[in-house]
Every structure is written in C-alpha cells, then in structure tokens.
C-alpha cells in the first residue's frame, strides 16, 4: 500500500515522500479498512510538530517513520474472527486510537469499536470529517462504558 510517513517532527515539510508500506494485519477484534478519505485533525498537526511526544513515543512500536492521521471513511476489506457487526464491503467511518496505525495511507486496522457504518446520505469526504466534531461525545461514551462496565 502507499502511505505518507514523517521521519522527524516539524512543519509540513516533514512530509517528504509517498512510499510503499506493508498492509497492516488485523487481530480477532479488528477490521481492515480500505481508506477512501481521511481528514486532518488538529491533533495530527500538533503530533507532527512533536506535541505529546513523550507519551506517543512510548506507545509506538518504532519511532520513525510514523504514519499520522486517525479519522477516516472507507470500505471494510477484512474482519477479525470475533467481529460480528461488520462484513467485507461495508462502508464505514471512524477514528483510530492506535498510535501504530495511522490513516495517511491506503489501509488501516481499526478496533471494531472505533468505527461505525457510514451514513448513506454522506459522501466519504463528509463522513471522514465528522470524527473531530464528535470527539466530545466519544469521550463521554468511553467514560460511561468504563464506569458502567465495572
């Protein structure tokens, strides 16, 4: 697959080239999505400049190259053995919390809880831009799940 990594922190000039990368594998709770559209979230710009690097560097398997991006819309290409909600061909949108699976590329792996069905009345571009708008709602949802699952 093609992707656009960064090799160091900095301004937009750190996006130097598009390169060939391996398509990510998925685990039993994940979905592989062929990305149709991705959006640039403000946190992506901050991460590119080094914001939160102490935390993010501890979470990443390798420091660089790093594929940024988290918000997407696309089409399901593969589902893990424990995924029941989605099937190949489903149109989805979502936001990844995985620091090792960015979205400035052609494919990304998502936990099944990080994506949902793309609304039929939205284009792929429109759906990819929704995720930042719902960040507050997602935070509340994750908090409620954590509180009530105990």
Model feature map: region roles:
Residues 1-4:
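Short structural boundary motif marking the start of a folded domain
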Residues 10-16, 42-43:
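Short N-terminal binding/cap micro-motifs at the start of the first secondary-structure element
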Residues 21-73:
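N-terminal glycine-rich beta->alpha transition that marks the start or flank
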Residues 61-62, 95-150:
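NAD(P)H dinucleotide-binding glycine-rich loop of Rossmann-like/cofactor-binding domains
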Residues 73-97:
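A glycine-/small-residue-rich N-terminal strand-loop-strand element
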